[in-house]
UniProtKB/Swiss-Prot annotation:
This is Cytochrome P450 1A1. Pathway: Steroid hormone biosynthesis; Lipid metabolism; fatty acid metabolism; Cofactor metabolism; retinol metabolism. Keywords: Cytoplasm, Endoplasmic reticulum, Glycoprotein, Heme, Iron, Lipid biosynthesis, Lipid metabolism, Lyase, Membrane, Metal-binding, Microsome, Mitochondrion, Mitochondrion inner membrane, Monooxygenase, Oxidoreductase, Steroid biosynthesis. One of its GO terms (biological process) is steroid biosynthetic process. Its cofactor is heme.
């Protein structure tokens, strides 16, 4: 006996035996998936889980915007729910209070990283950011990286008139951008700002890490930094290849580019580190790389830990710092420029504030930040509304624990939905509306309580180590640019602000930007 099925409009004959066998396999797999759960201690319960397909789980449900889909599911199932990608269970956290409870108050329980395939490709599996290690070695290296980053960014430079290294580097790059934008207006009359912002932001972190900047036409440098989209696509939460092993062996252009990018970036940094070793002088520390070499030669990270820093680990730490200070800042500035040209009223108000506080005789400085609350409110609203980091890098539990009465076993993969927090109607009035004024109090100052509810850099022990620098850098770039020029797009051009999902969500490139010099 044969039964006719239609697939993509084509009739396919299937025997009754084959149908019976397929049904039996389907039922068996479904039973295994549903029953393969850890034993839940008395008094606790398992997180609720929507229905999903056997073997596939919720891959098809997540679609192209998993942050939005999971936010919708949280409204039905609560702040703690479980999905499956393939057959792998994944805990999804939503809600500001729940996420703070997990990452801050129970930070030791949730500070791990899952051992995902894509993570093993970053720095040959030795990345401080993506490596599953969360023990004392990881903690010591993180402290070392934070101290080195602070020493060559927010610390003062005795040889400069700027307040700190970061201010000096950003001011130089902002000056270059202004000159470039004017040059482009004299030529083609329009431009894509991302093409130039990405290099200037990369040059700031290069100056901090390597003590040098690169020309905007350096092809090797451009080929690396312009592949950040591919990096974000692969390392984003929910990449099926991390959970369904067979997908790693199927043709995957993005995955191939990701592997190539990591290999080339490692070689790029390795070459710079070798050059630093050749010219290293103890007592004359030029940048972060020199600082790490000095620690390496001292053969310890701190006085209480017998942990050595190998030459290879220097490369990995520098790569992590580059990532922490590059892609997030570039994306933040890029989104900011889009909001400025689509909200001319907001842009004008920022420039009026800049003129009132700073005047026209000098450029903005980091010390001006407390006196520019509307610009700060604009940056906060850009972070919130775009939520361009929709999820943190996935976490994992380091031991059996419970959250909100739900049992969470050790080693569980955890997605933290930052987008949901930033668009939660319980926290924000009209969350879909772009309105910087929401962050200002009646006396015109920044509402500190509300500003702390915007989550974009993670929380707790895995919080982005470059957060403080990133916030300062975004502020100073925007302050200088808006002080000097007015941004707009070619008349009649409609700006596409549709987010493109990834570790950091980009937008479609716009080649119709224009600037007008402010008098």
């Amino acid at each position: 006996m044969w039964i006719m099925f239609s697939v993509f409009g084509l009739p396919i004959p299937i025997s009754a035996t084959e149908l019976l066998l397929a049904s039996a396999v389907f039922c068996l797999v479904f039973w295994v998936v549903r029953t393969w759960r850890p034993r839940v201690p008395q008094g606790l319960k398992s997180p609720p889980e929507p229905w999903g397909w056997p073997c596939l789980g919720h891959v098809l449900t997540l679609g192209k915007n998993p942050h939005v889909v999971l936010s919708q599911l949280s409204q039905r199932y609560g702040d703690v729910l479980q999905i499956r990608i393939g057959c792998t269970p994944v805990l999804v956290l939503s809600g500001l209070d729940t996420i703070r409870q997990a990452l801050v108050r129970q930070g030791d329980d949730f500070k791990g990283r899952p051992d995902l395939y894509s993570f093993t490709l970053v720095s040959d599996g030795q990345s401080m950011t993506f490596n599953p290690d969360s023990g004392p070695v990881w903690a010591a290296r993180r402290r070392l990286a934070q101290n080195a980053l602070k020493s060559f960014s927010t610390a003062s430079d005795p040889a400069s008139l700027s307040s700190c290294y970061l201010e000096e580097h950003v001011s130089k790059e902002a000056e270059y951008l202004l000159g470039k934008f004017q040059e482009l207006m004299s030529g083609p009359g329009r431009f894509d700002p991302y093409r130039y912002v990405v290099v200037s932001v990369a040059n700031v972190i290069c100056a901090i890490c390597f003590g040098r900047r690169y020309d905007h036409d350096d092809q090797e440098f451009l080929s690396l930094i312009n592949l950040s989209n591919e990096f974000g696509e692969i390392t984003a939460s929910g990449n099926p290849a991390d959970f369904i092993p067979v997908l790693r062996y199927l043709p995957n252009t993005a995955l191939d580019l990701f592997k190539d990018l990591n290999r080339r970036f490692y070689v790029f940094v390795q070459k710079i580190v070798k050059e630093h070793y050749k010219t290293f002088e103890k007592g004359h520390i030029r940048d972060i790389t020199d600082s790490l070499i000095e620690h390496c030669q001292d053969k310890r990270l701190d006085e209480n830990a017998n942990i050595q820093l190998s030459d290879e680990k220097i490369i990995n730490v520098v790569m992590d710092l580059f990532g922490a200070g590059f892609d997030t800042v570039t994306t933040a500035i890029s989104w900011s420029l889009l909001y400025l040209v689509t909200s001319p009223r907001v842009q004008k108000k920022i420039q009026e504030e800049l003129d009132t506080v700073i005047g026209r005789a000098r450029w903005p400085q980091l010390s001006d930040r407390p006196q520019l609350p509307y610009l700060e409110a604009f940056i906060l609203e850009t972070f919130r509304h775009s939520s361009f980091v929709p999820f943190t890098i996935p976490h994992s539990t380091t031991r059996d624990t419970n959250l909100n009465g739900f049992y969470i076993p050790k080693g569980x993969c955890v997605f933290v939905n930052q987008w949901q927090i930033n668009h939660d109607q319980k926290l924000w009035e009209d969350p879909s509306e772009f309105r910087p004024e929401r962050f200002l109090t009646t006396d015109g100052t920044v509402n500190k309580v509300l500003s702390e509810k915007v989550i974009i850099f993670g929380l707790g022990k895995r919080q982005c180590i470059g957060e403080i620098i990133a916030r300062l850098e975004v502020f100073l770039f925007l302050a200088i640019l808006l002080h000097q020029v007015e941004f707009h797009v070619t008349p009649g051009v409609k700006v596409d602000m549709t987010p493109l999902y990834g570790l950091t969500m980009k937008h479609a490139r716009c080649e119709h930007f224009q600037v007008r010099i402010r008098s």
